[in-house]
Amino acid sequence: MSLIVDASVAVKWVADEENSSRARALYLADDCMAPDLIIAEVGNAMWKKQRRNLVTAEQMKAAMLALPERLHLFDIAELAQRAAEIAIKLDHPIYDCFYLALAERERCALVSADAKLLAAAKKVKGIEARKL
């Protein structure tokens, strides 16, 4: 099954957090897709964890290598116009709206651990949102 995952899910693939085991099960079982923005978002989250000594520098670098290998990535330039439309309509940060635009376009469920993103997804017709 193809799913759109956001950074809140992908970080759990590479760092031990609440529901990491559920996120890793998705990683192993499903075809996961995301806008390429996810690399920067996960990188920033891992950098913050590395600064707080929650992960090592090696773990951070390994995460950056693993993401493009495991995820089917989509260029955000292709999603930008629709993401902007959604952001304006919902008054929601455009970062999240790239995931919504991709879920809408690909007709795939969006999986997230982010309550605000899931709430926004419910406001876009045709998007199935699933809490991790």
Where are these regions (language model features)?
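Short, well-structured N-terminal submotif of metal-dependent ribonuclease cores
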Residues: M1-L37, K49-K61, K125
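Short glycine/serine- and small hydrophobic-enriched flexible loop segments
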Residues: N44-R51, E104-R105
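Phosphate- and divalent-cation-binding pockets in alpha/beta enzyme and binding domains
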Residues: R22, E41, A119-A120
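Acidic, PIN/NYN-like endoribonuclease modules and their adjacent C-terminal/linker elements
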Residues: M1-S2, P35, H92, L100-L132
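Structured helix-beta-strand junction loops
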Residues: A29-D30, L67-R70, E106, V124
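N-terminal active-site wall of soluble small-molecule enzyme domains
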Residues: C97
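Contiguous, function-dense segments enriched for cysteine-driven chemistry
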Residues: D16, A62, R70-A77, S112-L118, ...
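Acidic catalytic patch
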Residues: D36-L37, Q59-K89, A101
